[in-house]
A protein has these predicted regions:
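Accessory terminal alpha-helical modules
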Residues: 1-174
Length: 174
C-alpha cells in the first residue's frame, strides 16, 4: 500500500498510530452525520494527504512511512497550537473537510520549505505558533461556506496570507 497509494497509507496511519492525534477519530463510514457536526472521514484525510504531497512537490517515489511521521508531527503541533479548537471539533472547522484539506496542504508547504532540515514537531511548532491561532476556526468564521477543492484552495490562500501578514509585521518590529 505504501508504494501503490502513499496518501492512503498516510491517512490510514493517522487513524491507526497511537501517537497520532487522529488515532481512532476519522469517520470510517457507516454513519450519516452531515454538515458542521461532521468530522473528517478517511476519504477526506486520503484526499488531504494527496494535497499535502502535491504541495510539498514530492517526487513520484515517495517514502510513505516518512510522510506518515511528518503528518503525525504536523498534527501534534496543530493540537498544541490550537488545543481549544481541537477539543471542540463540532464548533470548529479544524477537524472538518475544509480545515483538514487546507491544513494538510499547509503541511506540504512547510515540508517543502524545510528542505533538508529535519521535520519534527518542534519544527512545525516554530512555524505554526506565530500565526495559526490568529485564524478564526469557528464554524461561523471566515471559512464558513468554503467547500470542495476550490474552497480548500481559497482556505489555504487565506491561511498563507495570514501567515505572510504576521511575518511582515514581526519583521517590521524586529
Amino acid at each position: 500500500l505504501a508504494e501503490v497509494d502513499p496518501a492512503l497509507f498516510v491517512a490510514l496511519g493517522l487513524n491507526r498510530e497511537g501517537e497520532s492525534p487522529w488515532c481512532g477519530r476519522l469517520d470510517l463510514g457507516g454513519g450519516n452525520t452531515v454538515g458542521p457536526k461532521r468530522i473528517a472521514s478517511l476519504r477526506t484525510m486520503h484526499q488531504a494527504a494527496q494535497r499535502m504531497l502535491k504541495a510539498a512537490k514530492a517526487s513520484d517515489k515517495v517514502d510513505a512511512a516518512a510522510w506518515l511521521e511528518r503528518s503525525i508531527a504536523f498534527w501534534q503541533a496543530v493540537v498544541l497550537v490550537l488545543s481549544e479548537q481541537w477539543a471542540a471539533p463540532r464548533q470548529h472547522m479544524l477537524c472538518k473537510g475544509i480545515g483538514v484539506y487546507a491544513l494538510m496542504s499547509l503541511a506540504g508547504h512547510l515540508v517543502h520549505e524545510a528542505g533538508e532540515r529535519p521535520v519534527t514537531v518542534d519544527y512545525f511548532l516554530a512555524k505554526l505558533s506565530d500565526f495559526l491561532d490568529q485564524i478564526d476556526w469557528t464554524n461561523h468564521g471566515p471559512l464558513e461556506g468554503f467547500g470542495g477543492s476550490k474552497g480548500a484552495d481559497m482556505a489555504l490562500k487565506m491561511i498563507l496570507e495570514v501567515r505572510k501578514d504576521i511575518y511582515t509585521r514581526l519583521s517590521q518590529h524586529a
